[in-house]
Amino acid sequence: MAYDSRFDEWVQKLKEESFQNNTFDRRKFIQGAGKIAGLSLGLTIAQSVGAFEVNAAPNFSSYPFTLGVASGDPLSDSVVLWTRLAPDPLNGGGMPKQAVPVKWEVAKDEHFRKIVRKGTEMAKPSLAHSVHVEADGLEPNKVYYYRFKTGHELSPVGKTKTLPAPGANVPQMTFAFASCQQYEHGYYTAYKHMAKEKLDLVFHLGDYIYEYGPNEYVSKTGNVRTHNSAEIITLQDYRNRHAQYRSDANLKAAHAAFPWVVTWDDHEVENNYANKIPEKGQSVEAFVLRRAAAYQAYYEHMPLRISSLPNGPDMQLYRHFTYGNLASFNVLDTRQYRDDQANNDGNKPPSDESRNPNRTLLGKEQEQWLFNNLGSSTAHWNVLAQQIFFAKWNFGTSASPIYSMDSWDGYPAQRERVINFIKSKNLNNVVVLTGDVHASWASNLHVDFEKTSSKIFGAEFVGTSITSGGNGADKRADTDQILKENPHIQFFNDYRGYVRCTVTPHQWKADYRVMPFVTEPGAAISTRASFVYQKDQTGLRKVSSTTIQGGVKQSDEVEEDRFFSHNKAHEKQMIKKRAKITN
């Protein structure tokens, strides 16, 4: 087959249009390039296609689908299908610097007798041979099965589901949300259990990977696995770390079982970074390069649409999903646009700096986007799927309050603007989903947290970690004091797991699914407690509670231990960097 000259002609035409308009449309370029490349699947081995070579008949050193398959960002008529070719996943992937065609199929049945969509996508070295197929033309609220093929190799089969049509009457949905899965701190048994649930969707709220070198961040119950490299800095580093996490069988099973909607927190790049401001010990210029590498690796390993393709150190990740008329999900990015943490970060008393009315956590554009979505929503529930503690959370005393400068408490003016907007629209159906803090919490959301008699406009469900922090316990040494100082907080638990939510038009039920340990595989899972919120001003109501067998009843840990552990990890990193410089 002769080389198809339309590719070069199309690229030249796009360049001319871009120069004339003084703009460059990345999305148009990528979509167009994919279409033109698709014309060339019959090329001979290693024949050139534009700027890259295509290996149309690949032979692999070992099985290329080592990282499994995933789906995500579902809409009512489409879903993203993901995989990455990586026969040697922990050493850069083990692929040649050639593009490889990957066939994909979507079927109504798991035996692929009723195939409804199929095509070919190019796995390119520029994106670590990852594939992001936006499979469209699908029916609303339907289960589908998908798979990939390249050369003579066939991927595992994944199962996914489209969203109901916008505005459709939906009687119920069930989903889970998870966060914080430090690989060294434990085994991903929670995902083994999650994969067996009957779910429509999974949300991941951040800290999908951790950036630390081996045994820099150590849990109270000890590290039981080891990171595969020193602190990650470069694109290759981040790719290998994602691959290590993605190689876990339980995580792969959960990805293959349901569509996921993901957002990041800080450890996908580094601890507590704010916008383009890093931790101490590195320049802004070096950090911007690091952030760009981290963002690209994140995109390469997540089932995201091309609208989220990074542009250097920037990436569009906040987005909106509607589940019929039942729920409107606003997936936030509280990391990329925020002002620097006040008071030099950490857990501190409030100050003039933290109270500055101009401080932002979301950035102006995202804040306005959120208000537009909340203001126009006609859904039964308005959801903020995000990273950090939203409710006021004093873990000091009334006389000497202490707040996390990294959470919404460090940006009270931003929280007040959100609450004031909710108040102006007279909403009482707001649910905030949160990760980050490695423990389970449940809070009533008041228009004024200082007055528990003030209107309740919603509830916050904070999910515990998958592994981060180690085994945990039923309660901590500071639990009773925190609950006393924060009467709007109704529940705390420190075991590991995830949250399962069952939603109907009139009721939101959250089940806290936890395990007694993660430092060994095989832990059983139980529902520690279930809470219901019903939009009737009575707030959260506990409807069940269970004692977890086989775990620690109370630990000597307190909230600030998590902050101290990260500080110790950073100190270890700085010692290594100083030693490297002096040597």
Curated annotation (Swiss-Prot):
Keywords: Hydrolase, Signal, Stress response. InterPro entries: Metallo-depent_PP-like, PhoD-like_MPP, PhoD-like_sf, PhoD_N, Phospholipid_Metab_Enz. Pfam families: PhoD (PF09423), PhoD_N (PF16655). Residues 339-359 are annotated as: Disordered. Its EC number is 3.1.3.1. Residues 1-56 form the signal peptide. Residues 350-359 have a biased composition (Basic and acidic residues). The keyword Hydrolase applies. It is an enzyme of class 3 (hydrolase). Predicted to be exported by the Tat system. The position of the signal peptide cleavage has been experimentally proven. Induction: By phosphate starvation. GO terms for molecular function: alkaline phosphatase activity. It catalyses: a phosphate monoester + H2O = an alcohol + phosphate. Belongs to the PhoD family. PANTHER family: ALKALINE PHOSPHATASE FAMILY PROTEIN (AFU_ORTHOLOGUE AFUA_5G03860), PHOSPHATASE, PUTATIVE (AFU_ORTHOLOGUE AFUA_6G08710)-RELATED. This is Alkaline phosphatase D. It comes from Bacillus subtilis (strain 168). The gene is phoD.
